[in-house]
Design a protein with these regions (language model features):
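C-terminal scaffold of the Radical SAM
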Residues: 1, 22-46, 51-334
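Immediate flanking context of iron-sulfur cluster ligation sites
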Residues: 1-8
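A short, conserved structural fragment
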Residues: 348-356
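Short amphipathic alpha-helical interaction segments
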Residues: 333-346
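Local cysteine-cluster metal-coordination motifs and their immediate loop/turn environment
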Residues: 9-20
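Alpha-helix C-terminal capping segments
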Residues: 44-48, 177, 343-348, 375
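Minor-groove-contacting beta-hairpin "wing" of winged helix-turn-helix DNA-binding domains
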Residues: 357-361
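Short, amphipathic alpha-helical interaction segments positioned at domain boundaries
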Residues: 363-376
Length: 376
């Protein structure tokens, strides 16, 4: 089975911290975009991609700028061209500032069964600093509207280590989220990515992010609070109630095949050692390629045995499932210890092995970027 990702690269206003590809809103462009996606799906079905999908993910950008009818038409094309398994997970990312009761009901009726709401924080001051369209009450209302619309699988984004954030403010956010009682939480520390307005603000001294000690305390504090309240910390930034992990993202971390549709989307073909392809982040070029029946993708990254092994370890150690020696032996002919003896030794305080399965502790996840380097 494979996953399907569809990129909807439109935003009413781009957040200053975001480095994902997006375009400004133009009604004509948005209205024509679903047809491009359907043409791209048709092309992919004739050029190497076949079989049913078990997960579909509408990401962005702001997918909730598309109408429920547009989403329904795209899902109909997916079923026609490929098929969806029974109980496929179908996720739509939504901005609380763009949803209404009517369109949430429409999304649910179209086949969307998992909603990812980008609330980020319930603090009005921090929402303003992050450049979000919504305020605290609109975020809370969007969640309630989603419940009324029939969504019983909702994920919320939580950002921490925000400029000027206090421990008390983060604790208040966590309490607000727990009161909402979502099935899933994606919790990210704010980082200043290159070529974003936030990066320019930080490097110029206009804005400062919390120091490493605050970040570490916040990461562990989020882990402790959510773990004590019934959430499984199953990946560095992901928490879920029992049976509510994000199946689509698990496919990424397990190096399963996925097809990317839309400007800026990536695909991964799992044949042999694997190949990653991308659609350039250029809407005009994407439109030209799709409308002329050409391949809109280009080669991004190829893998040999060594690079595939390193990526398998990199992705696996991000998760609580970890890395299995038996699976490495079957796929690569070695155990983790045999392949990376020095890296394993250097990670010993944070890397544990139980019955041939290697996992990082929560403290190890906090140090992930440093600990993983010797494995790459």
């Amino acid at each position: 089975m494979a996953g399907l990702y569809l990129h909807i690269p439109f935003c009413r206003r781009k957040c200053p911290y975001c480095d994902f590809y997006s375009e400004g809103v133009c009604d004509t462009t948005i209205q024509g975009y679903p047809d491009l996606l359907k043409q791209h799906l048709a092309w992919a079905s004739k050029h190497g991609w076949s079989g049913s999908f078990d997960t579909v993910y509408f990401g962005g950008g702001t997918p909730s700028l598309l109408s429920p009818k547009a989403i329904a038409d795209i899902l109909h094309t997916i079923k026609q061209r490929f098929g969806l398994i029974h109980n496929a997970e179908i996720t739509l990312e939504a901005n609380p500032g763009t949803v209404t009761q009517e369109n949430l009901v429409g999304y649910r009726n179209s086949g969307i069964n998992r909603l990812s709401l980008g609330i980020q924080t319930c603090n009005d001051k921090h929402l303003a600093n992050l450049g979000r369209l919504h305020d605290r009450q609109e975020g809370l209302d969007a969640f309630d509207l989603a419940r009324v619309a029939g969504f019983d699988n909702i994920s919320l984004d939580l950002m921490f280590a925000l400029p000027g954030q206090t421990e008390e403010e983060l604790e208040s956010d966590l309490n607000d989220y727990l009161e909402l009682d979502p099935e899933h939480l994606s919790c990210y520390g704010l980082t200043a990515e290159l070529e974003t307005p936030l990066y320019q603000q930080v490097t110029s001294g206009e804005m400062s992010l919390p120091d490493a000690d605050f970040y570490a305390d916040a990461f562990i504090g989020v882990h402790d609070k959510l773990s004590q309240n019934g959430y499984d910390h199953y990946e560095i930034a992901s928490y879920a109630k029992k049976g509510r992990t994000c199946r689509h993202n698990l496919g990424y971390w397990q190096r399963r095949a996925y097809l990317g549709i839309g400007a800026g989307a990536h695909s991964f073909c799992a044949k042999e050692w694997g190949e990653r392809r991308e659609v350039p982040s250029d809407l005009a070029a994407y439109r030209d390629a799709v409308c002329s029946g050409q391949d809109p993708t280009q080669h991004l990254e190829g893998f040999d045995r060594e690079s595939a092994l390193s990526e398998t370890v990199y992705l696996g150690l991000r998760t609580r499932r970890g890395v299995s020696d038996s699976e490495l032996q079957q796929r690569f002919g070695c155990t983790l210890q045999e392949a990376f003896p020095e890296a394993v030794a250097a990670s010993a305080p944070w890397l544990t092995c139980n019955n041939g399965r290697w996992t990082l502790t929560p403290a190890g996840w906090l140090l992930f970027d440093r600990l993983i380097l010797p494995f790459l």
